[in-house]
C-alpha cells in the first residue's frame, strides 16, 4: 500500500494521519502528526492463541529524547527504562483499548507508540491514543473499535479540549477521558475540589469531542482498513459446561454467599478442588486431558462470575451481605509509628493501608528530565502492594505499572490540598504500604495519606477521602455499588474511584470491562460516591480534627531569609566553598533559589540561628548614615582603610579623620586601632567612604581678631 494522508483540524490544531509509508510489516501502523508532535504507532498480533487465562495485551509509550531536541542524561547517554510519565501514559492508552476485544480472545497483541517529535502545546499522549486505535482499526487484528481520547481543562468557567501548556497551568481541572462513539470507557483526572456537576459536564464535553475523532477514524478505516482475521477464541465444551453446572452449581452458590472473605474463599476453593479432582480422575489418560482441564477451570470461573452478578442484580445481595450503598466497617489511627515525621493507619473492612510521611529540604525534590523542560517535583506519593497483603507469595522488586498508577492517583488526589511552597517550603514524600487488601486499596492509601499529613502538621486545606464504586450491568438493568471489594471488582463491569474533600472532587479514575457507560450511570455513581466520601471524612475528622500546629520533633525545622539576587554568589562562594563551609560548621542544610530565597533546615534551632547569622553577615551591606565600630587595617598617605564588618572595608580619607588639619595619618591612627566611623558615601562600584569627624561636633570658627593674632604669631 502506498502512502495515504488524511487531514483535519482538531481543537484548533492541525491533525494529520499518514498510513502506508513506514512500519509496513506490522499488522497496522500509523504516523499521527498533531501540531508539531509526531507519534509512530505499530500494532502486531501473534499468530497463535496463548495458553494463559487472560488476554496478553501490551501497550508501550516510548519517549525518545531526540523528540524534544534533548540529550539523554547518565553516562550511557541513551534512553533506559520508561519514565513514570511514560508508564502512566501507556496505562492510559491500554485501559480504553482492552475492553474492545472479544471475550475469549487470547492472541498476544502489542501496541508500540514511539514519540518522534514533541510539542508541549500539542498532546503527544492523545496523539498516541488516536494512533493506537487507528493502527488496530485499520489492521487485520479483530479489534472492536475505534476509540479516542481527549484532555479537558476548565479555565475561568470554560471547558477547553486538549489545552496548551499555559491553559493547563491555569486550569482547575486535569482530565483525560476516552471512549467509543456511544459511551465513555476510561477516565483519569485531577481537580481542584470541583463539584460533581462540573465533573460530569466535563466528561460529557470530552465525549462530544471524542465522537468527532471517531468520525475521522471511521473515514480512514473505510479507505484503508484491512479485512479482520479469523482467530480462535477461548471457548469451553457446551456439554461439559452443562454437566458441571448441573452437578456443582448449588454447592458453589452456597460457598459464594459466605460473608467473611477468608471463609468464603476457603469454601469456594473447596468446591473447585472437588470438581477438579473428579475430572482429573476421569480424564487422566485422555489425550485431550490438558484442554479438558483448562475448560473445567474456565467453567468454574464463569459459574462464580455469574453467581456473584446474579446475587447483586436479582437478589440485591452482595457477597459479604452489605447493601449496595453500604461501606465496610471503618477504622482510623494516627501516630502508628514513632520517630517518623507522620503516620496514619486506615482500615476499611479487610483492606488496610499504612501511610508514612517524610519531610525534607527542597534540595531533595525529584528532578524530572523527560520530554518537557526539566522541572522539580516537590510532592511524591508512592504505593507499595506486597503479596502478603492478599495472603499469597509472589514477585518482589521494583514497582510495577499497577503500583506506579495507584501511586499517581493518590498523588493527584492529595496534591490539590497541599499548602503553597511559600507557606510550607518542604519536599513531601508519602509512602503507602498496603498491609491487607480486599479491594479499593488505592483509596485506602489516600485516606491514610490524609491522616499522615495532618498528624505531621502539614497545613493542608482540607482532608481528602477516597472511595471505589462498582457496576454490575446486563445491558438493560444495572446496579451501582459503593466500596467494592475484590470479588466485586473482579467480576464487575466498572472500577470507578472518586477522591475529594467536602468541597469537591480532587481525583477520578474509571476503568470498565464493557464497551462504555452512560451519563446516567456516571451521575448516579458520582452522587453515591459523594455520600460515601462524606461518611469517611466524618471518621477522619473524628480521629484528627485539623492539622497539628507544630511539626514532629524529628522533622527538620526551617527558617527562610531573603537576600539580594546579586548576593547569591557571595553566599555560595567559588565552587560552593562558602556554603559548604557554613554547612560543615553548623550541620544545617541550605537551599537557595534563583530569586534569593534562602531556606535553612535542621532539627536543631540553634544551628539554624547560627547559619542565619553567618549568611546575614556575608550579605550585609554598608549603608549611608550608618555608624560602625571599625578596625584600622591599612594606612596610606591619603587616609586609612578600616574594616566595618567581615570582608567589608571603607576608606577614611585624611580630610575625614578630624575637623582640624591632619598632616600624617600615622600620627593620628595605627593599624589595629578601633574607631567609630560613619558611612558618608557608597558609589556605584560598591566603594565605601567613611568619616570619623562626622561623629563629633564641628568646633566653632575662631573670631577674626583672634585669627589675625594667631596668624601674625605664626
Swiss-Prot record:
Biased composition (Basic and acidic residues): 700-714
Cofactor dependency: Mg(2+)
Sequence segments annotated as region (Disordered): 691-714
Major place of residence: cytoplasm
Chain ranges of the KH domain: 556-615
Pfam family, one: RNase_PH
Domain S1 motif: 625-693
Keyword Cytoplasm carried by entry: yes
Family annotation (InterPro entries): ExoRNase_PH_dom1 (IPR001247), ExoRNase_PH_dom2 (IPR015847), ExoRNase_PH_dom2_sf (IPR036345), KH_dom (IPR004087), KH_dom_type_1 (IPR004088), KH_dom_type_1_sf (IPR036612), NA-bd_OB-fold (IPR012340), PNPase (IPR012162)
Root EC class: transferase
Residues at which Mg(2+) binds: 489, 495
Gene Ontology terms for molecular function: 3'-5'-RNA exonuclease activity; magnesium ion binding; polyribonucleotide nucleotidyltransferase activity; RNA binding
EC number: 2.7.7.8
Sorted UniProt keywords: Cytoplasm, Magnesium, Metal-binding, Nucleotidyltransferase, RNA-binding, Transferase
Catalytic activity as recorded in UniProt: RNA(n+1) + phosphate = RNA(n) + a ribonucleoside 5'-diphosphate
Cellular component per GO, a single term: cytosol
Location of this chain's protein in the cell: Cytoplasm
Origin: domain of life: Bacteria
GO terms for biological process, alphabetical: mRNA catabolic process; RNA processing
Function: Involved in mRNA degradation. Catalyzes the phosphorolysis of single-stranded polyribonucleotides processively in the 3'- to 5'-direction.
NCBIfam families recorded: polynuc_phos, PRK11824.1
Entry similarity comment: Belongs to the polyribonucleotide nucleotidyltransferase family.
Name of the protein this chain belongs to: Polyribonucleotide nucleotidyltransferase
Gene from which the chain derives: pnp
Amino acid at each position: 500500500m502506498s502512502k495515504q494522508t488524511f487531514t483535519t483540524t482538531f481543537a484548533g490544531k492541525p491533525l494529520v494521519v499518514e498510513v502506508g509509508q513506514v512500519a509496513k510489516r506490522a499488522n497496522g501502523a500509523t504516523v499521527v502528526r498533531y501540531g508539531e508532535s509526531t507519534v509512530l504507532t505499530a500494532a502486531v498480533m501473534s499468530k497463535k492463541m496463548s495458553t494463559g487465562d487472560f488476554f496478553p495485551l501490551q501497550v508501550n509509550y516510548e519517549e525518545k529524547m531526540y523528540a524534544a531536541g534533548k540529550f539523554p542524561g547518565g553516562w550511557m547517554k541513551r534512553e533506559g527504562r520508561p519514565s513514570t510519565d511514560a508508564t502512566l501514559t501507556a496505562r492510559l492508552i491500554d485501559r480504553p483499548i482492552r475492553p474492545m476485544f472479544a471475550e475469549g480472545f487470547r492472541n498476544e497483541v502489542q501496541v508500540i507508540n514511539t514519540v518522534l517529535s514533541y510539542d508541549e502545546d500539542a498532546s503527544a499522549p492523545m496523539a498516541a491514543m488516536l494512533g493506537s486505535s487507528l493502527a488496530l482499526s485499520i489492521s487485520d487484528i479483530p479489534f472492536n473499535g475505534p476509540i479516542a481520547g481527549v484532555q479537558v481543562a476548565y479555565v475561568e468557567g470554560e471547558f477547553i479540549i486538549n489545552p496548551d501548556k499555559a491553559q493547563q497551568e491555569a486550569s482547575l481541572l486535569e482530565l483525560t477521558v476516552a471512549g467509543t462513539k456511544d459511551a465513555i470507557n476510561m477516565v483519569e483526572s485531577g481537580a481542584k475540589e470541583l463539584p460533581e456537576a462540573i465533573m460530569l459536564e466535563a466528561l460529557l464535553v470530552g465525549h462530544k469531542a471524542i465522537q468527532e475523532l471517531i468520525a475521522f477514524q471511521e473515514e480512514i478505516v473505510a479507505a484503508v482498513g484491512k479485512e479482520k482475521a479469523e482467530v480462535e477464541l477461548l471457548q469451553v465444551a457446551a456439554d461439559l459446561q452443562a454437566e458441571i453446572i448441573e452437578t456443582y452449581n448449588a454447592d458453589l452458590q452456597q460457598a459464594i454467599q459466605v460473608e467473611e472473605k477468608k471463609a468464603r474463599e476457603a469454601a469456594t476453593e473447596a468446591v473447585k478442588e472437588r470438581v477438579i479432582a473428579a475430572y482429573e480422575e476421569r480424564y487422566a489418560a485422555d489425550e485431550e486431558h490438558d484442554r479438558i482441564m483448562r475448560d473445567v477451570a474456565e467453567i468454574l470461573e464463569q459459574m462464580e462470575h455469574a453467581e456473584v452478578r446474579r446475587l447483586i442484580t436479582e437478589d440485591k445481595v452482595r457477597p459479604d451481605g452489605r447493601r449496595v450503598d453500604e461501606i465496610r466497617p471503618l477504622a482510623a489511627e494516627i501516630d502508628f509509628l514513632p520517630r517518623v515525621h507522620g503516620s496514619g493507619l486506615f482500615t476499611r473492612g479487610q483492606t488496610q493501608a499504612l501511610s508514612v510521611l517524610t519531610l525534607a529540604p527542597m534540595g531533595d525534590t525529584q528532578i524530572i528530565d523527560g520530554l518537557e523542560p526539566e522541572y522539580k517535583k516537590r510532592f511524591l506519593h508512592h504505593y507499595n502492594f506486597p503479596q502478603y497483603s492478599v495472603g499469597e507469595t509472589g514477585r518482589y522488586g521494583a514497582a510495577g505499572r499497577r503500583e506506579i498508577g495507584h501511586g499517581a492517583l493518590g498523588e493527584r488526589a492529595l496534591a490539590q490540598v497541599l499548602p503553597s511552597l511559600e507557606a510550607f517550603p518542604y519536599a513531601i514524600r508519602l509512602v503507602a504500604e498496603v498491609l491487607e487488601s480486599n479491594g479499593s486499596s488505592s483509596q485506602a492509601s489516600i485516606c491514610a495519606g490524609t491522616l499522615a499529613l495532618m498528624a505531621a502538621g502539614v497545613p493542608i486545606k482540607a482532608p481528602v477521602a477516597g472511595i471505589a464504586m462498582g457496576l454490575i450491568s446486563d445491558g438493560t438493568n444495572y446496579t451501582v455499588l459503593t466500596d467494592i471489594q475484590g470479588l466485586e471488582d473482579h467480576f464487575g463491569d466498572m472500577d470507578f474511584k472518586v477522591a475529594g474533600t467536602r468541597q469537591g472532587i480532587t481525583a477520578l479514575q474509571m476503568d470498565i470491562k464493557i464497551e462504555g457507560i452512560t451519563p446516567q450511570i456516571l451521575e448516579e455513581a458520582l452522587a453515591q460516591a459523594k455520600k460515601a466520601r462524606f461518611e469517611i471524612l466524618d471518621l477522619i475528622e473524628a480521629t484528627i480534627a485539623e492539622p497539628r500546629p507544630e511539626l514532629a520533633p524529628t522533622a527538620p525545622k526551617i527558617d527562610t531569609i531573603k537576600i539580594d539576587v546579586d548576593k547569591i554568589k557571595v553566599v555560595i562562594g567559588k565552587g560552593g566553598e562558602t556554603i559548604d563551609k557554613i554547612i560543615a560548621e553548623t550541620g544545617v542544610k541550605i537551599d537557595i533559589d534563583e530569586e534569593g530565597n534562602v531556606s535553612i533546615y535542621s532539627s536543631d534551632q540553634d544551628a539554624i540561628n547560627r547559619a542565619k547569622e553567618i549568611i546575614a553577615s556575608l550579605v550585609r551591606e554598608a549603608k549611608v548614615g550608618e555608624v560602625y565600630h571599625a578596625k584600622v587595617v591599612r594606612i596610606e598617605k591619603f587616609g586609612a582603610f578600616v574594616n566595618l564588618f567581615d570582608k567589608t572595608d571603607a576608606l577614611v580619607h585624611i580630610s575625614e579623620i578630624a575637623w582640624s588639619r591632619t598632616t600624617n595619618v600615622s600620627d593620628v591612627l595605627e593599624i589595629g586601632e578601633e574607631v567609630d566611623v560613619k558611612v558618608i558615601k557608597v558609589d556605584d562600584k560598591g566603594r565605601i567612604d567613611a568619616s570619623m569627624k562626622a561623629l563629633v561636633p564641628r568646633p566653632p570658627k575662631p573670631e577674626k581678631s583672634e585669627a589675625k593674632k594667631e596668624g601674625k604669631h605664626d
